[in-house]
Each structure stands twice: as C-alpha cells, then as structure tokens.
Amino acid sequence: MANQHFAKEAPETYWKTSTDLPSFPALQEDTECDVTIIGGGITGITTAYELTKRGFRVVLIEANQVLNGTTAHTTAKVTAQHDMIYDEFIRHFGLNHARLYYEANQNAIDYIKGIVDEHQIDCEWIEQDAYLYTANENAVQKIHTEHEAYTKLGIERDLIKDLPIPLGSKLALVMKNQAQFHPLQYLKALLEQIVQKGGRIYEETVALDIKKGERPEVVTKSRHAIKSRFIICCSHFPFYDGGGLYAARMYSDRSYVLAIKPKIEYPEGMYLSIDQPSVALRYTVVNGEKLILFSGVSHKTGQGKAMSTHYETLRQLAESTIGIESIPYYWSTQDLVTIDKIPFIGPMSENEDNILVATGFKKWGMTSSAVAATLLSDLVEKKENPYESIFTPSRFHLNPGLQKVISYNADVAKHLIKGKLEKPDVQFEDISPGEGKAVTINGRRAGAFRDETGCLHLVDTTCTHLGCEVEWNDSEHTWDCPCHGSRFKPSGEVVEGPAIKPLKQIDLD
C-alpha cells in the first residue's frame, strides 16, 4: 500500500496474526455420525460446540483451514444494534416480529458471555455500549424515529447529542450492555471443547454435493462420503441450494477495516454512523496500546471502482476524524445480505427438514452465529424454539421482499449481460508484474495476471457458479464475482464460494 501510514504492503488481519490456531487432518475415508456440519467459521464451530455438548456425534468439515474466512476478518462487535433496522422491522413485519429479533440477538450476547465464563476463556471480552450516530443535521429525525422503535420494543437505550469521541455527531442512539471480544481466541477454546467431547474436525475437505434421504450424505471432492441424520450448511453462501433459490434472495457485500494507532485518546464504546459512506469504530488492545478498528465503505462484491481506492477513502475519513499515527493492520471482508435483512436459519427447503442452513448475516455474525447454533441444535433435537418462524428460510414477506427480489435479480442480469458483451482492449504488454486485467483472447473475455517473475496467468473469467463474469480485485489480488460473491485466486482456484470449481485456465500454446 503506497500511503506512508500503512505499515504492511498487503492486507493482514490482526485476529489471525495474534492467534495460534490448531490444525486438523483432511478426511481420508467414508464415515458416519449424527450431524455433519459444513463450514469452519464461527457458525459451524459454535453449532458443533452446542451439539457435542448435547451429546451428539458431530463431524465438521472445512474446505480450507478453520477460521480462515469471514470470521477471521470481522470487527467482532457482539451486539443487537444491527444498524437502523428496528423501525423498519416494525413497519414491515410487526412489533412482535421485531421484538423477537431483538430478543434473539440480545440472548445471543448472554449465550456467548456464558461460554466465556464457563470455560474461563481469555478473549478480551469487554462490555460496551453501542452508539448509532449521525453527523448530518438532515438525518437527525432518522435517529429519533429509531429511538421511538427502541422505546416500543423495550430496549434499554439513551439519546445523546455529544459522543465521547469527536466524530461530529449531531445525535446518537445508545444501546446499553453490548460487548466486544477477540473472536479467534474465543473460538480456539471452542475447538478444544469440541474435540474433548468427541467431535471430529477435518480441514482441506471440500463438500461437492449432498445426496438426499433419510440419512443424507455429503460427498466430498476426494470422493469420501459422510452419512448422518442431519446436515448443517454453514459455508457462508450455501454450496448446495436444495431448491431454496438462495442465489436469487441474497447478495454479497464487501467492506474494509483499518487497524489504526490514532492521534486521539480513544474512550470506551462501539460506534456506527448512519451516514454515507458509513463507518464503524471499536478498539482492541495490541502490545498495551489501543488500536481503533475503523471500518466501512461497503459495496457489492466485484462491483464499483478499483478495490484499493476503498482503503484510501477509509483512510481519509479516519484522518479527518480521529487522526492517524500509523496503520499496523488492514483487511477486507464480505458477507451475505438477505433481501429482507433477516438471516436464513433453518431447513434448506420446506421438503427437507434434515438438511439445514445458516447464512445471510449482514455482517452481524457474532450474535447471528449464536442464534443459529441454538436454533439449529433445537431443530436437530426436535425441540421448539421461539425464534424459528422469524429466521426460517421458507418465509416470504410480500413487502418489501418481492420488490427487492426483482431489483436484485435485475442487477444480477445487468452484470451477467454486461460481462458477456464486454471485449476489453488490453494488450498483454500493458499488464505489469502484480497486475491483473480483463483481456480479449480469440474474441472472448479472459483474465490475465502477471506475477512478480513476469509469468502470465490466464483464466476464463466466467464464474463457475452461475456464469457471471468475474472482475479483478487489485487490493486482494483475486477475481471477484459481482453476482453472488465467489472469489478466485489469479490462477483460478476458489478462495470463497458459492463456486466450488476453479476458473478454467487458458493455455495459449
């Protein structure tokens, strides 16, 4: 990164560098269990923890290494303050629905805190108040309206004008008794508990397909199979759709994080702006000093301007508010957003109650993962759960769901058609080492990346998920799909799903 504030040339997440995670073998044989969990992030691990605690035989598989995806790149705010949602939820779904959503996520905070206390986990758990604020006089009424929603729902709250930190706030809404923590230190302890209780974990084990039945079967890339009573898909975007039409009901949204040594003295609290571009702040302590995690500048994955410019935009916003001494770490992440902003947690489809899913957390995965773990475990045990109807993937709300489905899929179609018609006028000699660009080969769009040795890597830019054309991400050095968020290495290997197969390599010889 060119700016003098950035201490590192490439993105790196603090959570990973500060945690020595265990490693696990790949699956080498067919096996059976009670529950197969696909996905080694916070949702899969927490669900495996809960199920092994309840006495179930669990196998968890991860395509890469555990805690290497979205969870490792979070800002780890443990809160039920999920942006400006409660007035919207009351208007669209009713007071009871909105109250249950809040209760589910507030209970999730207590659930996580209970695990931290039970196992004495050293994960920097600190209770914090969460602040929604605006620096725009024209948006003050929005804060008042959300405050009214908090009042209707009985949320412990406060309305203040001046924040403890100089962000130019005109008005702020406080949600009391939320929290922050170090997510990987917490989840490392859960991994240990899973293994102690007999759970089995396999890394580098890619799920390719699911065979339905009374005892459904996960088929892996190595052709080994896992039979179980239940399968739970926690793989971010579900690799298996099961007739649930998830590609038509979610989109992938990307955002950026700077870990900043600030010029100001940072107080307590977690802060989220409702203005555009929206930014969020919390702190973590590194080597005895507070670093501010300054995040935001979101956009749909694979869409918009050069990805590296988003870091610079975020840096400028931070410089103008908190001041910057240095930026020891920076990274980016993406998450899935459902059309109605409520996660999908429950049966993959109405006809398959033994294949379950958890996805679409809208970047609020710390509490959503705990909601999912308890709800999915109750479904496995055939126990009633008061939040089942809120999160069920088979729900359908006419307003605003239908309009957003139409709008979102029109956007997908636009990018699909645009990519197919595009014929980039870029020559191979125009691509410098470390650069990737779309090119035209034999009349067809392709992707070219030149590595530091000067070698050119060519791939077909057609995403192997549903056929959209991927775009180059100059910050992460990946090919990103603007339709459903799949990401690929310069040489075509899958970095992040829903795609399972790599981009096709092109050989000019």
From Swiss-Prot:
Disulfide bond entries: 468-483
Gene Ontology CC, one term: membrane
E.C. code: 1.-.-.-
Record's cofactor remark: Binds 1 [2Fe-2S] cluster per subunit.
A GO molecular function held by the record: metal ion binding
Domain Rieske: 423-509
Cofactor list: [2Fe-2S] cluster
Signal peptide boundaries: none
UniProt keyword annotation of ATP-binding present: no
Amino acids binding [2Fe-2S] cluster: 463, 465, 481, 484
Keywords, in A-Z order: 2Fe-2S, Disulfide bond, Iron, Iron-sulfur, Metal-binding, Oxidoreductase
Domain of life: Bacteria
Family membership noted in the UniProt record: Belongs to the Rieske iron-sulfur protein family.
PANTHER family reported in the protein's UniProt record: RIESKE 2FE-2S IRON-SULFUR PROTEIN YHFW-RELATED, SARCOSINE DEHYDROGENASE-RELATED
Listed name of the protein: Putative Rieske 2Fe-2S iron-sulfur protein YhfW
Organism, scientific name: Bacillus subtilis (strain 168)
